[in-house]
Regions:
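N-terminal Rossmann NAD(P)H-binding glycine-rich loop of SDR-like oxidoreductase domains
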Residues: 2-28
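SDR active-site strand-loop-helix element
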Residues: 9, 33, 75-76, 110-116, ...
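NAD(P)H-binding glycine-rich loop region in Rossmannoid oxidoreductase-like domains
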Residues: 38-42, 47-97, 101-104, 116-123
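Short-chain dehydrogenase/reductase
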Residues: 88-92, 124-135, 155, 159, ...
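Conserved beta-loop-beta element that borders a ligand/cofactor-binding pocket
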Residues: 114, 136-160, 166-167
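Conserved loop-to-helix N-cap of the C-terminal "lid" that shapes the substrate pocket in Rossmann-like
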Residues: 148, 158, 181, 186-194, ...
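A conserved pocket-lining segment of Rossmann-fold NAD(P)-dependent short-chain dehydrogenase/reductase
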Residues: 167-188, 192, 196-207, 212
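Mid/C-terminal beta-alpha module of Rossmann-like enzyme folds, strongest
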Residues: 199-262, 275-299
Length: 299
């Protein structure tokens, strides 16, 4: 086993589960922070994995969690504000705490999960702007060896994209009204994303880089929803809403429990989630297609 313990924030989520498994398979012991570790004991099946309770993400708390680690991975992010969490707190303030804590206990390496087209000033939504602010903060800190990753929508077993649309399609009768149907995505496989992160850990040449990660093909949102409906055997007429309808849907849906669609989501969709240059190839990774993988887990 490699003598480098990796501390992971957000390790109990979709990408986190896949990353812990891949790191363990590559010989890296992991320390995963969780507010409710008893709910995530499955992570302990990965050899060398330690699951720690974390009562908060303040600098002093994180210093103790990071002690003895050689790298920190931050996968924490939210798509909507609520439950006392704001984009500023999660995407910006947390990064400040991580950097301060890591430097205080001499952790040299930091991997940061950002988002495709995250830009501090030019982002079309608060989500993208705060993601950009956090990313810029990390790269501006000369005391850390930083690599960030900017994926398009990520798919794979347990994802929140195809599985979510599958659930919505199952409960929607006949007609499925879709906001922003022409928004474009290049869905990237979670296995390719975590491969990029593991390779970056081992390669000093990745320090300081910001990697855009995309799948090999581009699709409209409408095409992805129709593909999902076909896979789960639901005949639905997917009707793209005009812009005024999309805005109205967002204003109504953001008032519902769970906020299935918000105005900030709408604004994020005004920027196509596609790569100008896909950096997976630079990392020696051949991106896998959704057609080869999604049918294996979506029901």
């Amino acid at each position: 086993m490699i003598n480098h313990r990796i501390c992971i924030l957000g390790g109990t989520g979709f990408v986190g589960h896949h990353l812990v498994s891949r790191l363990a398979a590559s010989g890296y012991p992991c320390r995963v922070l969780a507010r409710r570790p008893e709910r995530h004991r499955d992570l302990l099946l990965a050899p060398g994995t330690e699951l720690r309770w974390s009562g908060g993400f303040e600098t002093d708390v994180l210093k103790e969690q990071f002690r003895g680690c050689t790298a920190v991975v931050n996968l924490v992010g939210i798509l909507n504000e609520g439950n006392g969490q704001t984009f500023q707190q999660v995407h910006v303030n947390l990064v400040e705490h991580i950097l301060a804590a890591a430097q205080a206990v001499d952790v040299p390496r930091y991997l940061h999960m950002s988002a495709l087209h995250a830009q501090a000033t030019e982002g079309t939504s608060r989500y993208l702007r705060t993601k950009g602010m956090g990313e810029d903060l990390a790269h501006a800190d000369t005391g850390m060896q930083v690599t960030s990753f900017r994926p398009s929508v990520i798919f794979g077993p347990g994802d929140g994209f195809f599985n979510r649309f599958a659930t919505l399609l199952k409960i929607t009768p006949v007609v499925f009204p879709l906001a922003c149907p022409d928004a474009r995505f290049a869905p990237v496989y979670v296995g390719d994303v975590v491969s990029a992160m593991v390779r970056a850990l081992a390669d000093p040449g990745c320090v300081g880089k910001r990697y855009d990660l995309c799948g090999p093909r581009i699709y409209s949102l409408k095409a992805l929803v129709e593909y999902t409906a076909d896979l789960i055997g639901r005949r639905r007429i997917v009707i793209g809403l005009p812009d005024v309808g999309a805005r109205l849907q967002a204003r109504i849906f953001q008032l519902l429990p769970g906020k299935p669609f918000t105005m900030d989501n709408y604004l994020s969709l005004q920027t196509d989630s596609i790569c100008g240059h896909n950096n997976l190839a630079e990392l020696g990774i051949q991106p896998q297609t959704m057609e080869a993988l999604v049918p294996g887990y979506l029901r």
